[in-house]
Regions:
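A short, N-terminal "cap"/entry segment at the start of jelly-roll beta-barrel domains
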Residues: 1-46, 61, 131, 135-160
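Conserved metal-binding segment of the jelly-roll/cupin
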Residues: 55-57, 83, 93-113, 123-125
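Short strand-connecting beta-turns/loops that link adjacent beta-strands
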Residues: 41-42, 67, 86, 114-115
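Short, charged/polar surface micro-motifs in flexible loops or helix N-caps
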Residues: 41-45, 55-59, 76-80, 129
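A short beta-strand-loop-beta hairpin characteristic of the jelly-roll/cupin
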Residues: 59, 67-95, 105
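Short glycine/proline-enriched turns and hinge-like loops at secondary-structure junctions
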Residues: 45-47, 65, 93, 112-114
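A short hydrophobic beta-strand segment most commonly corresponding to one strand
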Residues: 51-52, 71, 100, 115-134
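Conserved short histidine dyad/triad with adjacent acidic residue
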Residues: 32-38, 50-66, 103
Length: 160
C-alpha cells in the first residue's frame, strides 16, 4: 500500500440491516434462507452469511453443500441434525450452540420443537450457492427408535 491511500469510507466496514436480507438464494425444501453478507450486499469475496428459519415441527430435505464448509449458530429453538450415508447419526443443539458441517456431508436439519420456529445464523466458506438435494434411504425414523433393555420395555410388545 506504499504510495497509495486506501479509500476506507467506501472499502471499510459494512452494516447490512436485518430488514434488507436477500431471499433470492438457493433453497432447500423445509427451510428458508436469506443472505445478509455476500458479494452483492457487502462486497465479500470468500464468505456467505445469512439467516435460516425452519418452521415448527419441520425438517429439511437431505442435502449437502459440495466443497463448502458451513457453520450454523442457533439463535432460538432446538436443532436436531442428522447426517451420514443413511442419516444414521444424530445430534442436537440449542440457543448459543455452534454446529460445524464439513464439505460433502449428507445432512438434514430438523426443528425439534413442535410449537416454535428454529432461528439460526448460517456462515459458509464461499460465495458459490451450492445446495445438492439428495434422495437417499434413511436408516430409520428417529421418532420410532426405542431404547429397549431390561429397564425399558418394548412399547410394541404384547402384554401376556
Amino acid at each position: 500500500m506504499a504510495g497509495r491511500s486506501k479509500n476506507w469510507q467506501d472499502n471499510g466496514i459494512k452494516v447490512i440491516s436485518g430488514e434488507h436480507l436477500d431471499s433470492n438464494t438457493p433453497q432447500t425444501p423445509g427451510m428458508n434462507r436469506a443472505a445478509a453478507i455476500n458479494h452483492a450486499t457487502a462486497g465479500a469475496h470468500k464468505l456467505w452469511a445469512g439467516t435460516v428459519t425452519i418452521h415448527a415441527d419441520a425438517k429439511t430435505g437431505v442435502h449437502h453443500h459440495g466443497e463448502l464448509e458451513s457453520i450454523i449458530f442457533v439463535v432460538s429453538g432446538q436443532a436436531r441434525m442428522r447426517w451420514g450415508e443413511k442419516l444414521e447419526f444424530v445430534c442436537e443443539a440449542g440457543p448459543g450452540d455452534f454446529i460445524y458441517i464439513p464439505p460433502h456431508v449428507p445432512h438434514q436439519e430438523i426443528n425439534a420443537c413442535a410449537d416454535k420456529a428454529l432461528e439460526c445464523i448460517l456462515v459458509r466458506s464461499d460465495q458459490e450457492p451450492v445446495v445438492v438435494n439428495l434422495d437417499i434411504p434413511v436408516a430409520e425414523d428417529p421418532g420410532e427408535v426405542f431404547w429397549i433393555d431390561p429397564i425399558h420395555a418394548n412399547p410394541n410388545a404384547k402384554l401376556s
